Amino acid sequence: MRHGHGLRKLNRSSSHRLAMLQNMMNSLIEHEVIKTTLPKAKELRRVIEPMITLAKQDSVANRRLAFNRLRERASVTKLFNVLGPHFRLRPGGYTRILKMGFRVGDNAPMALVELVDRPGVATEENNSASAEQ
């Protein structure tokens, strides 16, 4: 008996779904914030959070596991050299999903997925606040 497993099919074949989530993971690691539909954002959160947890311990085996999922060397390097050390003390909850209303063409619910306490943003906000004073 199948029973429910909490997987969103997103109206795609399994290979298309895996490739889409892989591309979205690479984009989120590279840009640290992406805009997508709400169901895709919720599914992305399920796959990116374990990747960041994996990056908190830098080892060859963990890098190979990450590369097996991401398939992009630059993303793996940033994940282990920047994001892993940045989130080392955070026990989980590395992403934030902000609802952005509805898309004009098809009224699909849109969302902004971003990394919590993004490494580049905190220093820029502090610098701009001190520059204004």
UniProtKB/Swiss-Prot annotation:
The keyword Transmembrane does not apply. Gene3D superfamilies: Ribosomal protein L17 (3.90.1030.10). One of its GO terms (cellular component) is cytosolic large ribosomal subunit. This is Large ribosomal subunit protein bL17. Disulfide bonds: none annotated. InterPro entries: Ribosomal_bL17 (IPR000456), Ribosomal_bL17_CS (IPR047859), Ribosomal_bL17_sf (IPR036373). One of its GO terms (biological process) is translation. The gene is rplQ. Part of the 50S ribosomal subunit. Contacts protein L32. GO terms for molecular function: structural constituent of ribosome. It comes from the Bacteria. SUPFAM superfamilies: Prokaryotic ribosomal protein L17. PANTHER family: LARGE RIBOSOMAL SUBUNIT PROTEIN BL17M, RIBOSOMAL PROTEIN L17.
